[in-house]
UniProtKB/Swiss-Prot annotation:
CDD domains given in the database record: YlxS_C
Taxonomic source organism: Ruthia magnifica subsp. Calyptogena magnifica
Keywords attached to this entry: Cytoplasm, Ribosome biogenesis
Family: Belongs to the RimP family.
Cell compartment(s), UniProt: Cytoplasm
Keyword Cytoplasm appears in the UniProt entry: yes
Gene Ontology biological process terms in this record: ribosomal small subunit assembly; translation
Organism lineage string: Bacteria, Pseudomonadati, Pseudomonadota, Gammaproteobacteria, Candidatus Pseudothioglobaceae
Protein name listed in UniProt: Ribosome maturation factor RimP
One Gene Ontology CC term in the entry: cytosol
Gene: rimP
Chief place where the protein resides: cytoplasm
Functional note: Required for maturation of 30S ribosomal subunits.
Length: 154
């Protein structure tokens, strides 16, 4: 799956940037005959609305019709990251330092795959960050995270 998302990221990153949006990240869910491609966009101006998503979706659909980065049928979903924003890159962890996050690792660490805590210090050199939980502090490798989302504290 990483190859598919890498290929798509390379294909659309500049297009989205030229449209004055930030490509937050991509999720590709292969599901039998029909897959889902989720593209998360943002902007630092006013946030992302339905019209923004529609505009980007049309542009990406045109590109995908020509380039065909995904074989078989798929649904393209373009959306804002929302308040429980997904985290994809090291820069996201740096940007949301001190925020609550829930995440799932690719493989267990000390018998656990699911973690919840506060994003602590990010170490750029080895691509890790500290996750401060209620009872412990864990150092996690960003490359080994399957899925991570901010958690809103009301």
């Amino acid at each position: 799956m990483a190859r598919v998302t890498d290929k798509i990221t390379h294909l659309i990153e500049l297009v989205i940037k030229d449209m004055c949006y930030e490509l937050v990240g991509i999720e590709y869910v292969a599901s039998g005959k029909h897959s889902i491609l989720r593209v998360f966009i943002d902007t630092d101006k006013k946030g992302v609305g339905v019209n923004d998503c529609e505009k980007v979706s049309r542009q990406l659909s045109s590109i995908f019709d020509v380039e065909e980065p995904i074989s078989g049928q798929y649904t393209l979903e373009v959306s804002s990251p929302g308040i429980e924003r997904p985290l994809f890159h090291k820069e996201h962890y740096q940007r949301f330092l001190g925020a609550n996050v829930k995440l799932r690792m690719v493989r267990p660490i000390d018998g656990r795959r699911n973690f919840f805590g506060v994003i602590g210090c990010v170490n750029e050199a080895d691509n890790t960050f500290e996750l401060v939980g209620e009872l412990d502090l864990v150092i996690l490798d960003i490359d080994l995270i399957e899925k991570a989302n901010l958690v809103v504290d009301f």
